[in-house]
């Protein structure tokens, strides 16, 4: 099991945001803010956080309606981006590198477009540019029932059968087949604290998100590193998405051959190896 995160702290507000911050960091090094994917929590960075924190001030936080953060009446992409801005302004308090996965990548992208003075650079892990599209309610019905249930066994069963967003290292298709970082008994701790209303919001879709994403792609001037999986394995950056991302002012796209959507979870060493040169470039700029 990876090293645990530091003790959670709370940023008061609406909603409250649980965050994890070891402080420190080398002189002249940018702080790093980690933004997790949908249905996860800050523990999803446990295999990355300690490695980054040896050199950089590293901060992670639970998105609204996830983990230890508060629930909210609004689960639009705009709301998630506003929370990223709150973290930058009230906790990080200096220009940072934002590292976001999937939903977290989109929140980071929009925050960077809205507040360029707060962002040194972006690492976007398999950003889901098609976020506006609604999730399939049938695919998430059992999981939602499990999250809402007061019986832990109901959620455990739903998680064990829930399909992975991309195949595991040995071709696994469900969380129940996995061992290690994304084993079902670990992922249960992610899902159990998700607000069922978040799933309701995603199955309804988020039409305004499309314009938000397009607008941000035109506004962001900071350097951007996109880490992408293979679309055939569940990666979200297909040819059309890559074409859109390459309209960013300063962007590099790197593929993870043989990987899908869960890059840092399944390939932490490769993930770190890819972002370290990007961080050196930021230091020298």
Residue ranges and their predicted role:
Residues 1-16:
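N-terminal cap/lid segment of alpha/beta-hydrolase-fold proteins
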Residues 113, 120-156:
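Flexible "cap/lid" loop of the alpha/beta hydrolase fold
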Residues 18-70, 279:
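Conserved HGGG/HGGXW glycine-rich cap/lid loop of the alpha/beta-hydrolase fold
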Residues 107-111:
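Hydrolases whose catalytic domains are alpha/beta-hydrolase-1, hotdog thioesterase
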Residues 132-138, 152-218:
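Conserved alpha/beta-hydrolase catalytic His-Asp/Glu region
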Residues 259-268, 272:
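Catalytic histidine-centered segment of alpha/beta-hydrolase-like enzymes
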Residues 50, 219-259:
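Conserved loop-alpha-helix segment in the C-terminal half of the alpha/beta-hydrolase fold
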Residues 21-23, 49-50, 59-99, 103, ...:
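Active-site loop/oxyanion-hole signature of alpha/beta-hydrolase fold enzymes
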């Amino acid at each position: 099991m990876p090293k645990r995160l530091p003790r959670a702290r709370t940023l008061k507000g609406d909603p409250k945001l649980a965050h994890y911050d070891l402080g420190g960091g080398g002189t002249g090094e940018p702080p790093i803010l980690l933004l997790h994917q949908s249905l996860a929590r800050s523990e999803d960075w446990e295999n990355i956080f300690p490695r980054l924190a040896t050199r950089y001030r590293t901060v992670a936080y639970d998105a609204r309606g996830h983990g230890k953060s508060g629930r909210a009446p609004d689960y639009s992409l705009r709301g998630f981006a506003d929370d990223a801005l709150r973290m930058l302004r009230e906790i990080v308090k200096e220009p940072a590198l934002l590292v976001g996965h999937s939903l977290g990548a989109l929140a980071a992208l929009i925050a960077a477009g809205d507040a360029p003075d707060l962002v040194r650079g972006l690492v976007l892990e398999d950003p889901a540019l098609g976020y506006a599209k609604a999730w399939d309610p049938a695919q998430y019905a059992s999981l939602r029932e499990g999250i809402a249930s007061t019986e832990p066994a109901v959620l455990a069963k739903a998680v064990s059968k829930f399909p992975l967003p991309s195949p595991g290292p040995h071709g696994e298709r469900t969380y129940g087949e996995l061992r290690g970082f994304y084993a079902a008994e670990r992922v249960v701790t992610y899902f159990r604290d998700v607000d069922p209303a978040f799933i309701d919001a995603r199955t309804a879709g988020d039409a305004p998100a499309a314009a938000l994403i397009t607008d941000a792609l035109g506004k962001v001037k900071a350097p951007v590193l996109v880490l992408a999986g293979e679309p055939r394995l569940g990666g979200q950056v297909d040819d059309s998405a890559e074409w859109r991302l390459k309209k960013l002012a300063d962007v590099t796209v790197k593929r993870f051959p043989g990987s899908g959507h869960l890059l840092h979870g399944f390939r932490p060493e490769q993930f770190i190896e890819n972002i370290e040169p990007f961080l050196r470039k930021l230091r020298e700029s």
